Swiss-Prot record:
Keywords recorded for this protein, A-Z: Cytoplasm, RNA-binding
Gene this chain is encoded by: smpB
InterPro entries linked to this entry: SmpB, SsrA-bd_prot, SsrA-bd_prot_CS
Compartment list: Cytoplasm
Any coiled-coil regions, as ranges: none
Main subcellular location: cytoplasm
The organism of origin for this protein: Prochlorococcus marinus (strain MIT 9515)
Protein name: SsrA-binding protein
Domain of life: Bacteria
A cellular component annotation (GO) from this entry: cytosol
Amino acid sequence: MIAKVSNKSNKSNKKEAVFKRLAENRYAKFQYEISETIEAGIELLGTEVKSIRNGNVNLRDGYCSFRDGEILLLNVHISPHKNVGSFFNHDPLRNRKLLLHKKEIFKLKSNTEKKGLTIIPLSIYLKGSWIKLTIGIGKGKKLHDKRQADKQKDIKREIKTALKR
């Protein structure tokens, strides 16, 4: 007897992508006024993947730059994996290629050149089994802008406490 197999996919069998945030750049939200965010993949080595999954990554000083039609993630520290010898381990501050479509790269490049914007890594997370990076396009805040943002946060906090009473 031959069983018929239908080509229709069963929605109940599909697994939903699970998001697990591994690191976040809180400093970027204070330093920059972020106008747009984009999800990008990262080209990583095996020991880097293990280290990121353990949460040993620092995005604070990171930024993105263009080279030969590609976008690179610079100055992001991914600690060497502990259980691997030094010969097989990676360089913690090496340049990592971001995986984006050509149109997205062109759009980012034109925005940064014309408007004087910066591309900053905001967070790194797991999407299913893939490691993804959220990059933000933003402009650096001046000192008075930072002070004004702090004052507004304090005012909102005072209003919330007053309403709770």
